[in-house]
């Protein structure tokens, strides 16, 4: 198994799909990485040479991925909470942040229904 950005990349998958196993790399960014390194998207990771894997490591290293990205997202949310702005309050209360309706939906964010005691 190849190890890129501290993650074991699955060998049996195509390069584009295997790169999406890294947090912060989706399909579009994986395609861009393959284009920049000159590696075909339909080649499996097990078929790549060590030199090609090193190229992938270097290209992935240019992006904020995995732990650094998770930390950045957490700090951004914490900053909103500290500011006390509307988005921070919505995060604090566990409600949708981006203007979705909450009268009938938003069950994922709000959690299971709580019965009203009479």
Curated annotation (Swiss-Prot):
Domain of life: Bacteria
GO cellular component, one term: small ribosomal subunit
SUPFAM superfamilies: S13-like H2TH domain
A Pfam family recorded for this sequence: Ribosomal_S13
InterPro entries linked: Rbsml_uS13_C (IPR027437), Ribosomal_uS13 (IPR001892), Ribosomal_uS13-like_H2TH (IPR010979), Ribosomal_uS13_bac-type (IPR019980), Ribosomal_uS13_CS (IPR018269)
Function per UniProt: Located at the top of the head of the 30S subunit, it contacts several helices of the 16S rRNA. In the 70S ribosome it contacts the 23S rRNA (bridge B1a) and protein L5 of the 50S subunit (bridge B1b), connecting the 2 subunits; these bridges are implicated in subunit movement. Contacts the tRNAs in the A and P-sites.
Similarity comment: Belongs to the universal ribosomal protein uS13 family.
Subunit and partners: Part of the 30S ribosomal subunit. Forms a loose heterodimer with protein S19. Forms two bridges to the 50S subunit in the 70S ribosome.
Protein name, UniProt field: Small ribosomal subunit protein uS13
């Amino acid at each position: 198994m190849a190890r890129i950005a501290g993650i074991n990349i699955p060998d049996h998958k195509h390069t584009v799909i295997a790169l999406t196993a890294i947090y912060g790399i989706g399909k579009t960014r994986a395609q861009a990485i393959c284009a920049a390194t000159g590696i075909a998207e339909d080649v499996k990771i097990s078929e790549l040479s060590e030199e090609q894997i090193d190229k992938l490591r270097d290209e992935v290293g240019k992006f904020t991925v995995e732990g650094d990205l998770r930390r950045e997202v957490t700090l951004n949310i914490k900053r909103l909470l500290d500011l006390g702005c509307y988005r921070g309050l919505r995060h604090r209360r566990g409600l949708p942040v981006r203007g979705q309706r909450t009268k009938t939906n938003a069950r994922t964010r709000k959690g299971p229904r709580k019965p009203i005691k009479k």
